Amino acid sequence: MSKPIVMERGVKYRDADKMALIPVKNVATEREALLRKPEWMKIKLPADSTRIQGIKAAMRKNGLHSVCEEASCPNLAECFNHGTATFMILGAICTRRCPFCDVAHGRPVAPDTNEPLKLAQTIADMALRYVVITSVDRDDLRDGGAQHFADCITAIREKSPAIKIETLVPDFRGRMDRALEILNATPPDVFNHNLENVPRVYRQVRPGADYNWSLKLLERFKEAHPEIPTKSGLMVGLGETNAEIIEVMRDLRRHGVTMLTLGQYLQPSRHHLPVQRYVSPEEFDEMKAEAMAMGFTHAACGPFVRSSYHADMQAKGLEVK
């Protein structure tokens, strides 16, 4: 029997080390058991990476993180090449250990009190007009990191008054009242929280999270700010069915959510949950049609769609696949 891992503060635990800490064990996928990617999942990288390297350099210079890099997003090259990025605040170590996610798990250090100003200055220097701010889960903080979100929103708006800000927040487990009290005083332009998948597979996909809690978070923010769009995202390929996805979409509408993202799950490493199916572009189109018929004002559905993928276009209601 292997020795238990003793986590050191500030150390990133990834792949096999991270999965070893999850109560519901996941057996590493052997190469021959991997599903072959269909043609529609092939990514063409840009010929010129100058813009990509420039954004990475700006991040490193200011000690900032992007979820694009930390979560190994397949759209990194495209988004960075277009000068867009989703900033990840509160460090790069998550207190949760979801087996679909490539963000590191561990015992995070205290939040950087200078991060809001550094973030605001970086965004101003990049002359961004739309920005997405997300974070790791911080179950070690009494407010789940809500005040840090609010401080970042305030600092960004001071330096870039015309900017639109979307927040992709964690579930603030056990801290919803306090978190919403803080965020209600400094609301974003779009409030996003991802359900990720269907309730039947939550124990395997989102250990430590609760489906109904996440729905309630979205509903309560919408009740306080009916004029602000609420948004949520789902992944397919984790053992769910299309019928179950459509039922989750109905739950989201019942809780006031108006914007939806739906994309294909991709396995970050052999130690993460395996891809159980690849959903075709035609099926994504069918689910988008279902979403629009339910009353979603915007629905971005496609193999490479992620919650913050072309978020500015999503907010404008433009076609995103």
Swiss-Prot record:
Keywords: 4Fe-4S, Cytoplasm, Iron, Iron-sulfur, Metal-binding, S-adenosyl-L-methionine, Transferase. [4Fe-4S] cluster 2 binds at residues 94, 98, 101. Binds 2 [4Fe-4S] clusters per subunit. One cluster is coordinated with 3 cysteines and an exchangeable S-adenosyl-L-methionine. This is Lipoyl synthase. Belongs to the radical SAM superfamily. Lipoyl synthase family. The gene is lipA. It is found in: Cytoplasm. SUPFAM superfamilies: Radical SAM enzymes. It comes from Citrobacter koseri (strain ATCC BAA-895 / CDC 4225-83 / SGSC4696). Its main location: cytoplasm. Pfam families: LIAS_N, Radical_SAM. It is an enzyme of class 2 (transferase). Its cofactor is [4Fe-4S] cluster. Signal peptide: none annotated. It catalyses: [[Fe-S] cluster scaffold protein carrying a second [4Fe-4S](2+) cluster] + N(6)-octanoyl-L-lysyl-[protein] + 2 oxidized [2Fe-2S]-[ferredoxin] + 2 S-adenosyl-L-methionine + 4 H(+) = [[Fe-S] cluster scaffold protein] + N(6)-[(R)-dihydrolipoyl]-L-lysyl-[protein] + 4 Fe(3+) + 2 hydrogen sulfide + 2 5'-deoxyadenosine + 2 L-methionine + 2 reduced [2Fe-2S]-[ferredoxin].
